[in-house]
Amino acid sequence: MALFSSQAQAFNQTRQTYLARELALANTHWTRLRGLLGTSRSDFRNGCGLWIVPCRGVHTLAMRFAIDVVYLDRAQAVVHIEQDLRPWRFAPVRLQAASVLELPCQTIAGTGTAVGDKIEISLGKDARRQLD
């Protein structure tokens, strides 16, 4: 199960709105492979998210709920979005993506997030150490 932290957040600078106020980081082989597997829909509530680095595509195999997916380039600009990706599906691989945000359904629609938006990822000190 992903460990969501209120110290790590994803903020849409273009729309001036939060995509995730509690963000988990998946940046090792194991955490990227596991992703949200084992996370319940009630644990993955509005305001939560998973940032997968590096990542160019995702799947929802063995998941029990749908998600929204935001693909980010190296500058953390949105290059593609997938809304309501249902369980047992593959999202397209986007070669221009450097990372992906997995979010609860309706996050993209609720925030108005669109291709070209700039996303700021702020990490707590523990998460920053994991990226180094």
What residue ranges belong to the model's regions?
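Compact, glycine-rich, soluble single-domain proteins
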Residues: M1-D132
